[in-house]
């Protein structure tokens, strides 16, 4: 069964442009009748009749509206560049939040308004990213820079054309498509203009939240640097050369376009732009793109937090005494630090007002909840329910965070660089001070540990390594980013730290406990106050890390894993050497590009 009504945007948003009915009223027989009648009463009647028909007419009006007769600059551009059929498809450009709510509720299965006012949407079969289906077009302008391999698999220009044509063909079958224009990057010198062309209102609202929203006057003549064609509801042809499934997420740096087929997971658009910035930043502007959160103290001191999922990146950067620059994606340039995004994309599984009040309160009108379970009567969301996925999310404008710094940038260079890890073996110190080579080694390693599921019978934690804490999104070789980071740290005299939010006293398997959040926050406070830089340090063997002998607010016995260990000396030696070996094994694939001092900065087993 098709749509109950044809929905498109009204082409008569400009009051100066007369709609056909108004044109008939102002000329022709009807107009003569009105003009020849001098009765004020009759004039009022005709005026009231017009108002009744045209005031407050929304997209849900039974008569619907049709594509523009006189095409806009934006429509002409889409028609010329992508052959969007603007005579058949209504192009809804930069719609309001309210109209996107209406469209999502009427046309998209699984959408609803929750009790907090947020829109909830269902992303379909795919509830997370599809990294194995990511492709980069292999073409002359970028092929010598790209880090080819499992992360960036090549796609031929011919296959790109097939997939792009398939996406555009699908978009041309829709009654309406949405266009969202915005910026990636808060620094005007380095930002890129992004256009999203999609078929789902949920996707449009998501990217409206995640991109930086331009003033209305800047949208009138907006010309994108990069365009995303999201036809995620339509599959790729899995028999096309190089396709591994019916899902395809492809980026063409020469054409400055991205095409999505076979996945409706909105995060693919966000992370696609992130990959673009990982390429454009270093290659075009010599700026460093980072998978990090960032905040700023009252004196303007900036801290960057790197970390994989579950290490505390979002939690620790949310500090009542510091302003949030951003929670996920940043660039470090010669002009300071800036956020790439205009919004936040927070995990919501297990969310509560007590644990994360800022995120909880940001879930309101204008926000998009993704794949959550809610009570159909009360519309209250059960954030503990992972029936659809563990990866439940919410996208909201960064303005919804009370202590966000708007604009989201700082002219100051970072004073502290914090590499977060969650070591479930309990053998990494809660805090270590890193030198330049160690910073590069641990940045490239990107270590954390994930707890094994009980169903597979494995009791010990699983080591996870993600280069630069961002491996799925990298465009260039990790060493290129690591060298840039080391240079910037050296040039701006930044302090680098390895902060373990994982287990202390013993590992997870030996009955240890996770480091209390109050101690982790005390460590951060000592870093920000400068106290931790001035205490006495000792060398921690195997990993050769500099560990403080004391830290305000933290028991001294917890600072060195060897002295804190409660599960027997033999088990400690076994665990620390085992983890050291995993680090060395993982780093082998980067040794050909690494300098001798960086290789030697790893563990000595």
Swiss-Prot record:
Pathway: Carbohydrate biosynthesis; gluconeogenesis
Residues that hold ATP according to the record: 307-314
A GO CC term assigned to this protein in UniProt: cytosol
GO molecular function, one term: phosphoenolpyruvate carboxykinase (ATP) activity
UniProt xrefs under InterPro entries: PEP_carboxykinase_ATP (IPR001272), PEP_carboxykinase_C (IPR013035), PEP_carboxykinase_N (IPR008210), PEPCK_ATP_CS (IPR015994)
PROSITE patterns: PEPCK_ATP (PS00532)
Residue ranges of the region described as Disordered: 27-67
Compositionally biased tracts (Low complexity): 27-48
Parts forming coiled coils: none
Nucleotide-binding recorded as keyword: yes
Keywords: ATP-binding, Decarboxylase, Gluconeogenesis, Lyase, Nucleotide-binding
Enzyme nomenclature, EC number: 4.1.1.49
Pfam families: PEPCK_ATP
GO biological process, one term: gluconeogenesis
Catalytic reaction equation(s): oxaloacetate + ATP = phosphoenolpyruvate + ADP + CO2
HAMAP family, per the entry: PEPCK_ATP
Sequence similarity: Belongs to the phosphoenolpyruvate carboxykinase (ATP) family.
The protein's name in its UniProt record: Phosphoenolpyruvate carboxykinase (ATP)
Gene name of this polypeptide: acu-6
């Amino acid at each position: 069964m098709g749509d109950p009504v044809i929905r498109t945007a009204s082409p008569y948003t400009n009051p100066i442009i007369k709609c056909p009915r108004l044109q008939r009223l102002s000329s022709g027989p009807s107009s003569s009748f009105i003009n020849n009648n001098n009765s004020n009463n009759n004039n009022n009647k005709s005026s009231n009749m017009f108002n009744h028909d045209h005031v407050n007419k929304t997209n849900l009006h039974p008569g619907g509206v049709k594509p523009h007769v006189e095409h806009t600059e934006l429509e002409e551009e889409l028609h010329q560049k992508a052959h969007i059929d603007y005579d058949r498809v209504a192009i809804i450009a930069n719609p309001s939040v309210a109209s996107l709510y209406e469209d999502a509720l009427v046309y998209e299965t699984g959408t609803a308004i929750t009790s907090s006012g947020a829109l909830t949407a269902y992303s379909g079969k795919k509830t997370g990213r599809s990294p194995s289906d990511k492709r980069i077009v292999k073409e002359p302008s970028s092929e010598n820079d790209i880090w080819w391999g499992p992360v960036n698999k090549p796609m031929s220009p011919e296959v790109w054309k097939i997939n792009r044509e398939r996406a555009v063909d699908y978009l041309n079958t829709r009654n309406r498509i949405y266009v969202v224009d915005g910026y990636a990057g808060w620094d005007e010198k380095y930002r890129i203009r992004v256009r999203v062309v999609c078929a789902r209102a949920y996707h449009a609202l998501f990217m409206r939240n995640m991109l930086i929203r331009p003033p209305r006057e800047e949208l009138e003549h907006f010309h994108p640097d990069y365009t995303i064609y999201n036809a995620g509801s339509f599959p790729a042809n899995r028999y096309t050369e190089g396709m591994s499934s019916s899902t395809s997420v492809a980026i063409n740096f020469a054409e400055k376009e991205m095409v999505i087929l076979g996945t409706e997971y909105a995060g693919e658009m966000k992370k696609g732009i992130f990959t673009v910035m990982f390429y454009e930043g270093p290659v075009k502007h010599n700026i460093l793109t980072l998978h990090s959160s960032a905040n700023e103290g009252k004196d303007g001191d900036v801290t960057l937090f790197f970390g994989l999922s579950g290490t505390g990146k979002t939690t620790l950067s949310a500090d009542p005494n510091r302003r949030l620059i951003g929670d996920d994606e940043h660039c470090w340039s010669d002009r300071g630090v800036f956020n790439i995004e205009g919004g936040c994309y927070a995990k919501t599984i297990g969310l509560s007002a007590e644990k994360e009040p800022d995120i909880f309160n940001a879930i309101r009108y204008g926000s998009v909840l993704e794949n959550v379970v809610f009570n159909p009567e009360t519309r209250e969301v059960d954030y503990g329910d992972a029936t659809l996925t563990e990866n439940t999310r919410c996208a909201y404008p960064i303005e919804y965070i009370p202590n966000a710094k708007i604009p989201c940038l700082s002219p100051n260079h970072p004073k502290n660089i914090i590499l977060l890890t969650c070591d479930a073996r309990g053998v990494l110190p809660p805090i270590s001070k890193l030198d330049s080579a160690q910073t590069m080694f641990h940045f490239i390693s990107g270590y954390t540990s994930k707890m094994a599921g009980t169903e597979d019978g494995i009791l010990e934690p699983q080591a996870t390594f993600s280069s630069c804490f961002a491996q799925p999104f990298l465009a260039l070789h990790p060493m290129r980013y690591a060298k840039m980071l080391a240079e910037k740290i050296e040039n701006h005299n930044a302090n680098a730290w390895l902060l373990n939010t994982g287990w202390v006293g013993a590992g997870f398997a030996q009955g240890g406990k996770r480091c209390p959040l109050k101690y982790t926050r005390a460590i951060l406070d000592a870093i920000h106050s400068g106290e931790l830089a001035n205490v006495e340090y000792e060398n921690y063997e195997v990993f050769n890390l500099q560990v403080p002998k004391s830290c305000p607010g933290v028991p001294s016995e917890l600072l060195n894993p060897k002295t804190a260990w409660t599960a027997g000396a033999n088990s400690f030696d076994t665990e620390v050497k085992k983890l050291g070996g995993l680090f060395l094994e993982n780093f082998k694939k980067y040794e050909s590009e690494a300098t001798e001092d960086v290789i030697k900065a790893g563990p000595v087993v």
